[in-house]
Every structure is written in C-alpha cells, then in structure tokens.
Amino acid sequence: MRILYGIQGTGNGHLSRGEFIYQLLLKKSTQIDVLLSGDNYSLTPSMPIKYRNKGVTFVINNGKIDYLKTLGNLDLFTSYVEQKNIPFKEYDFIITDFEPITAWASLRYKIPSIHISHQASFIESKVPRPESRNILGEYIMKYFCPTNDYIGLHYKSYGPSISEPIISSDILDFNSKVRGHVSVYLPWYDDDYLYDFF
C-alpha cells in the first residue's frame, strides 16, 4: 500500500506527532511519502520529506489565528503550481494532520483518507469550547481538511472518534522530579502577553 502523509507546518506539534506516526506507519508499509505544507516550525524533521508546499499556513498572534495576516500570507498560485507536481493518483491511502492539500486531493481523486489531529476532535459536538464561539474557527476546524474518516486527539475522549494525545515513549518513560516547578510550553504567545497571567 502506498501512503501519502500530509503534515501541517504551522508549529511544532503537527511535526512532532508526524514523526511518531511516521515510525508507526513504517511497521505496516514501506511506501510512505510525506508532504510538509507550510514552514512555520522550528524542528528539523528526521523523516524524509518528499514534497514541500508553501500551503496554507496560519499566522498566530498571542495564541490566536490572525485571519488578516493569514490572508495576506496566502500564495494560492504558488501552492497550486506545487500541487500540480504531486502524483496524487499513485497513492492508495492519504493521512492528513490538519493539512488541506492532501485532504482535498483525497476527495478530488476518490482516495480513502483519514484526518488525525487535535483539530479533528472539534468535528465532535461534545468537545468543550469557549462560551463565546468563534464561528469562523468552527468552520475551519470542520471543513479545512475534509476526509472520509477522522481521529481527533484531545486530553480525554469526548466521543468514539477521539483518542488521547499521541505522546512519544521518550517523554512517557522520562523519570522526572517536579520539586514544585512546572514548565508550560506556550510558543504562540508573546512574553509580554504572558507576564500578565504569571
């Protein structure tokens, strides 16, 4: 089975999860090609990246999508040209981690597909949301990456298609001593913004 795995390049979470899933996929298939869409990450991928696409990368400002800057950053022509060089029809299965190019290609070419990401969990109505709902955000979560099926990743299961987060065994097996200190990773927030909370 030939698999195309699309990974969103907005942040490190998609990429680190992608590394873990890629290793699991190698146990089932040796024909896995990775498409990395966008370039807003700081990790260096260890898996081979066959396709790179400018893609649709969200601009984040203080933990929220900046829709105007995201629109200004779009280069749909370049993204379209890059997609023309990807032989989607040669794949038997498509997996996407909130990556729209592979998701939409799976529908266009009728290739079985699955969306695995935290964002996919918001397809389920039982997943908690803020009191003031962001209608555009809800729409993006539901329709940005349409696939045949999905597995949402959340802190607990709110439905049959939601699993707990994927965490590498290196982290799970790490023997740490808290000693009254907890570090929180919030890369999308400016330090000045966070000082008000801490």
Predicted regions and their residues:
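Conserved nucleotide-sugar phosphate-binding/catalytic loop shared by glycosyltransferases and other
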Residues: Y5-G9, T30-T78
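A short, glycine/small-residue-rich beta-strand->loop->alpha-helix junction that serves as a flexible
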Residues: G6-E19
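A short, Lys/Arg-enriched amphipathic alpha-helix followed by its capping loop at the start of a domain
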Residues: I21-Q31, L43, F197-F198
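Conserved nucleotide-sugar donor-binding subdomain of glycosyltransferases
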Residues: K64-F93, P100-I101
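Active-site proximal beta-strand in glycosyltransferases
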Residues: R108-E124
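Structural motif
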Residues: R2, D92-F93, D149, H181
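An aromatic- and histidine-rich active-site surface loop
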Residues: S42, I94-Y109
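A nucleotide-sugar donor-handling region in carbohydrate enzymes
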Residues: E124-D192
